[in-house]
Amino acid sequence: MMKKTILACVFLQLVLGTVFAQTVDSTHIKNMHAYYKKHFSDPTDPIVLTASDTLLDMAIRCNDTVMSKIALGAKLDYYYYGQGENRTDSVIAGVNRLKRFARSVGNAELYYWAWAARLVNYYIIQGEYNIALLEAEKMLQEAKKEGKQESIAECYYALANVYAAKGLMKKSQEFMLKEIDIFENTDVVRYNISCQYSDAAKIYIDLGEEEKAPELLKKALKAVKSPYHAVTANLVYVSLYLAQGDTVAARQALEKCRQMYADEPSLKRHIHYLYDVEIDYDWKVGNYQKALNVLDERETELKRKNNLATLMQLRKTKADILWDMNRKEEAAGLYRDFLLEQKKEKERNEEVATG
């Protein structure tokens, strides 16, 4: 959650319209939080498109910067998480709106968060990796000019995500650890640092260095500030136990994660992370058909959202599973598709770089 500041009238006039200074009634604050809890647990629900306007009005009356940010970001998240037509234009417009708001209230953290966590990540989801990288590098240049460590940390977060999407995991981890270093050695607050600990641990596991993961996962759990942080760390524990050959512990950890998703509605938007770990678990323990069934469900969802980048990675996983099932001809066809898509992506990236 962004640090809370009180909006001065001049900022409200510039950003949100003319508002008269007033004493905030505690009833208004309670009503605002109740309204938020009622309508904003699921960012993919169309109700947020109208509810966000109402929440913004409430936030203005309460002089609440945090709720103003949430209200402005609600429409952005609706499109970011895969809803509505003209998504790209809507995401860009929403990011720019949030960045303008952040500059007007002097919130550099929000400014770079909108740029990194929404615009850069959106391009990653769309498979536009070079555009994402260009945006992340522009961010870093701007942040270094300003000289604020918290802004630079947000840029490291963005660069880590881009390199992970490009399959350059060691490079991705390098930027994760840079962000972690800023968090551990300065007074910079990183709300989502728990996820960076978890993600860095997962890369160690994937690189066959799982002995380095437990310390990072302990730090991840210690830094938890939301259900999403907690479930992210626990999902990585599933991968750790699988790497250690402890399938019993892996199954227990997976069941714990399933229960966490069932108990917390706000995790619905992140359900794909659970599915990915379920696929990996079933694959590793030999439940190949079950893994393929979950994978097919994921493919259907990704096609609906037109998430082509993740779809191709998933098909590579499907090919790996089919190969282990000795269905080598089917696997070979998927491998060819994957390599062809990689070639096309390289050509697209070269065009972007030339442009």
Which residues does each predicted region cover?
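N-terminal leader/linker segments that initiate helical-solenoid repeat arrays
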Residues: 19-77, 84-96, 104-109
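Hydrophobic positions within repeat-based interaction scaffolds
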Residues: 22-34, 38, 45-49, 89, ...
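Residue signature of alpha-solenoid helical repeat architecture, marking inter-repeat boundaries
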Residues: 26, 66, 70, 109-111, ...
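Residue register of alpha-helical TPR repeats
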Residues: 30, 70-71, 113-114, 154, ...
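Structural register within alpha-helical repeat arrays
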Residues: 35, 75, 118-119, 152, ...
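Short coil/turn connectors between adjacent alpha-helices in alpha-solenoid helical repeat scaffolds
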Residues: 37-47, 79-91, 120-132, 163-171, ...
